[in-house]
């Protein structure tokens, strides 16, 4: 039985979603017995789709916002997801988050990062993305937003 690959919470430039199976196939035998260090996390496609390690798991990325999203999913998933569910997929929400330069705490930073990455074209956090193409009877980008927010609990449990 083929296991469905888990999508990362957001797209990143150079993301490894399509390569993740190949990368994982080339891990050493019994890799789950060892510590796992991910120095360039990005969207986390490899991390989310590999067999969980029983040892230490360390993720890192030069983009602090990326780490804050995974931290929120690990430490406060219910609060994080609840706040995201209240965010409407709209250009106004995107622009408001784009203007933010200071955050109350890491959770506020994580929400900002998630909104900017999921509501922008290609996850680049620069321009709002909107598609007239329909998916599930609604615009594609709106459908993708609702779908990923529903999948966040599973992503959060992936390697906790």
Predicted regions and their residues:
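SAM-dependent nucleic-acid methyltransferase catalytic core
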Residues: 2-31, 74-159
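Conserved S-adenosyl-L-methionine
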Residues: 32-91
